[in-house]
Amino acid sequence: MGPEEVMVQASSPGLISATEVLVAAATFCLLLLLTQTRRQHAPKGLRSPPGPRGLPMLGSVLELRKDPHLVLTRLSRKYGDVMEVTIGSRPVVVLSGLETIKQALVRQAEDFMGRPDLYSFRHITDGQSLTFSTDTGEMWKARRKLAQNALKNFSIAASPTASSSCLLEEHVSTEASYLVTKFLQLMEEKQSFDPYRYMVVSVANVICAICFGKRYDHDDQELLSVVNVVDEFVDVTAAGNPADFIPLLRYLPSRNMDSFLDFNKRFMKLLQTAVEEHYQTFDKNNIRDVTDSLIEQCVEKKAEANGATQIPNEKIINLVNDIFGAGFDTVTTALSWSLMYLVTYPHMQKKIQAELDQTIGRERRPRLSDRGMLPYTEAFILEMFRHSSFMPFTIPHSTTRDTVLNGYYIPKDRCVFINQWQVNHDEKLWKDPQAFNPERFLNAEGTEVNKVDAEKVMTFGLGKRRCIGENIGKWEVFLFLSTLLQQLEFSIQDGKKADMTPIYGLSMKHKRCEHFQVKKRFSMKSSN
């Protein structure tokens, strides 16, 4: 056979097609066999969780492409609070129902406190993140507690100014005052504006002040670079990473994954610069911020016998990364959704402002100690968290050992999704859950928030993996919102409408709105 004949035969569509079919069929059979082999059968007397069968190799991935929180909520009505779906080649247990989730994350916390070994998680701070790490041992617990304490201590530490009771109040007050001035300036210049761009920088400034003891000018390129890369992270992860569930995709080009890796590299470089500056100027007699506090632990604890509380130098950057993340995107998104609800329901805005005027007046700014005296404001914030459910799922969990939940056998290392959206819209818990109604959280007199109902709202997870920035985040949202509403009235341009349709992602955003307007309510007479 001559060279030309070989080339003609090799390029024959019929032969190539037959070869491809045979290879595809063999691959299909092999992967199907592997998938079936990987599925662990329940021990005698126990059942595996029910769920949809899905397609070979793809599982339910096609069903879950759009609004997976809604799809999984719908499936839970058919299969129950403990069900199993297959995403790609990975079996995933999905938990719904508040009591079932509490049973798993609180009462059986040790069983469900793991993180799955997802491909994307390995690239966040080189797999050493407290939040995303698969580690659950004593060292992880000690470092998590240390980070939690550092964040709390430098938020509630006494403020040097008389107008604020703690550093968090001082930082938020500074940023909220800037926003009031900026929003009024934008009204004069443009007659309408998008508040998100300015709020995100102010929230970043608060967490920078807590972590690095530094407030940046809003046009500072260093601060803007932090904001931009965090925004990119949210955009990239919003699409999800299919390679987490279909391993074959790890070896194929992916623009999303390239962007994800690039973000992690740039963000770590920014944090590394800040931490190195703190090392160079560290003074154990003058602990300035969270980073100094962590360095102090690293320096002072080296001589102690308990190695679990020691932090290697390189781990400090990872802890700062976790603390920064805990106080940034959630607060920004909560404030953004709050403003959308306020302009959509202006009568609720007026009720909050009446409460602020009556309780605080116009002589001073709101403080954290005012929260208990502002029940309607607190109820509005709770309803914003519940109704928007902008964190539809927690970060995925995994089982640390073989366990049983509600009579269903769940093997070790099983990926677990927690459907927070389902809990927040469960008709068994909430009357008319699709309605936005802050009064649902108030007693009959409207004078107190019902704490039992408040604790049913899921935003920050539960149990041993609960977000370390939960309390700080709630405090920030309260202080920003009450300070802005004390001084400004928000509205939408005539003829325009705020689009409240959620856009699915790591945290669900709404479409950006450029039609906000503000009006000054009064001039602040005093800052005391």
From Swiss-Prot:
Induction entry: By 2,3,7,8-tetrachlorodibenzo-p-dioxin (TCDD).
Binding site for heme: 467
Cofactor list: heme
Matching CDD domains: CYP1A
Entry membrane topology: Peripheral membrane protein
Any one Gene Ontology molecular-function term assigned to this protein's record: iron ion binding
Any one GO cellular component localisation term in the record: endoplasmic reticulum membrane
Keyword Glycosyltransferase: no
Membrane in keyword set: yes
EC number: 1.14.14.1
Reaction equation(s) it catalyzes: an organic molecule + reduced [NADPH--hemoprotein reductase] + O2 = an alcohol + oxidized [NADPH--hemoprotein reductase] + H2O + H(+)
Protein's cellular compartments: Endoplasmic reticulum membrane; Microsome membrane
Listed Pfam families: p450
InterPro entries tied to this protein: Cyt_P450, Cyt_P450_CS, Cyt_P450_E_grp-I, Cyt_P450_E_grp-I_CYP1, Cyt_P450_sf
GO BP annotation list: cellular detoxification; cellular response to mycotoxin; response to antibiotic; xenobiotic metabolic process
Keywords carried by this UniProt record: Endoplasmic reticulum, Heme, Iron, Membrane, Metal-binding, Microsome, Monooxygenase, Oxidoreductase
Family affiliation: Belongs to the cytochrome P450 family.
Cited PANTHER family: CYTOCHROME P450 1A, STEROID 17-ALPHA-HYDROXYLASE/17,20 LYASE
Function of the molecule: Cytochromes P450 are a group of heme-thiolate monooxygenases. In liver microsomes, this enzyme is involved in an NADPH-dependent electron transport pathway. It oxidizes a variety of structurally unrelated compounds, including steroids, fatty acids, and xenobiotics.
Stated name of the protein: Cytochrome P450 1A5
Gene from which the chain derives: CYP1A5
